[in-house]
Amino acid sequence: MRPILLQGHERSITQIKYNRDGDLLFTVAKDPVVNVWYSVNGERLGTYNGHTGAVWCVDVDWETRHVLSGSADNSCRLWDCETGKQLALLQTNSAVRTCGFDFGGNIIMFSTDKQMGYQCFVSFIDLRDPSQIEDNEPYMKIPCSESKITSAVWGPLGENIIAGHENGELNHYSAKSGEIVNSIKEHSKQINDIQTSRDMTMFVTASKDCTSKLFDSTSLEHQKTFRTERPVNSAAVSPIYDHVVLGGGQEAMDVTTTSTRIGKFEARFFHVAFEEEFGRVKGHFGPINSLAFHPDGKSYSSGGEDGYVRIHYFDPQYFDFEFES
């Protein structure tokens, strides 16, 4: 499995995201650039320039018309996907940690960090109402006083968002009323990443407590647990098989103080039903920060602390593989 190496960032990767068709791959890092690549051959299509700080999150809508990015320069920006033109600039009081389009691409949500005396907020803006963008006035802002949000995605049908917190909590926030509909605490440490399955019925979390867990999207019921020996930074669900891929590794500041075994940085494949690991892919120099499966399930990509993004196309053996418990 020879990976395609994408080198378009000077700093460590923070998030990577495929569009719905899977022909484009969006990458952001701790530098101010948002990159977009052709996933088939790794050719860089272009960049979205405008941010002045590290970019923490990126999302693309269902029709690949708009791109959304959130940055440590205290702004969330909306871009025209095709031309790279900035369509909207939403100023915030603190860094934007997560962002996302809803199912129809009309409503965006983004969450801000708890820093510099400001509280963590989740904001919802309806793009069909120009006044909300011009006045920088979201139709709803939900304060999170307890623990800040570290990862968030839209739930099924755009009715609510699933948010993971610094203390390991998972919450369902209603996109209409802003109330917490459901709450669960299955992780003991920070939730680094949440990704839904292709049909949005399940989602997988990645946590600093060295586990990744599978949950039901509507009830938040805990289904499966995948255990590792090191913090998990990202996890993704295969769209065609009962597989999840986990990526992680020690934080950069802890690397010199731990044994080399804990500092390993492979992508690890687990079977969903049996919770068993069945494969590993080496490659990155340093921890893996973000993972994404291609929507057709025939390849996956990983972004690392080394600033590289690797696109891996699976070998034929992967598709013939039968898991025996």
Curated annotation (Swiss-Prot):
Transmembrane segments: none annotated. GO terms for biological process: cytoplasmic translational initiation; formation of cytoplasmic translation initiation complex; translational initiation. WD repeats lie at residues 8-47, 50-91, 144-183, 186-225, 283-324. One of its GO terms (molecular function) is RNA binding. Keywords: Cytoplasm, Initiation factor, Protein biosynthesis, Repeat, WD repeat. InterPro entries: eIF3i, WD40/YVTN_repeat-like_dom_sf, WD40_repeat_CS, WD40_repeat_dom_sf, WD40_rpt. It comes from the Eukaryota. GO terms for cellular component: eukaryotic 43S preinitiation complex; eukaryotic 48S preinitiation complex; eukaryotic translation initiation factor 3 complex; eukaryotic translation initiation factor 3 complex, eIF3m. Gene3D superfamilies: YVTN repeat-like/Quinoprotein amine dehydrogenase. The keyword Repeat applies. It is found in: Cytoplasm. Signal peptide: none annotated. Component of the eukaryotic translation initiation factor 3 (eIF-3) complex, which is involved in protein synthesis of a specialized repertoire of mRNAs and, together with other initiation factors, stimulates binding of mRNA and methionyl-tRNAi to the 40S ribosome. The eIF-3 complex specifically targets and initiates translation of a subset of mRNAs involved in cell proliferation. Component of the eukaryotic translation initiation factor 3 (eIF-3) complex, which is composed of 13 subunits: eif3a, eif3b, eif3c, eif3d, eif3e, eif3f, eif3g, eif3h, eif3i, eif3j, eif3k, eif3l and eif3m. PANTHER family: EUKARYOTIC TRANSLATION INITIATION FACTOR 3 SUBUNIT I (PTHR19877:SF1). Belongs to the eIF-3 subunit I family. This is Eukaryotic translation initiation factor 3 subunit I.
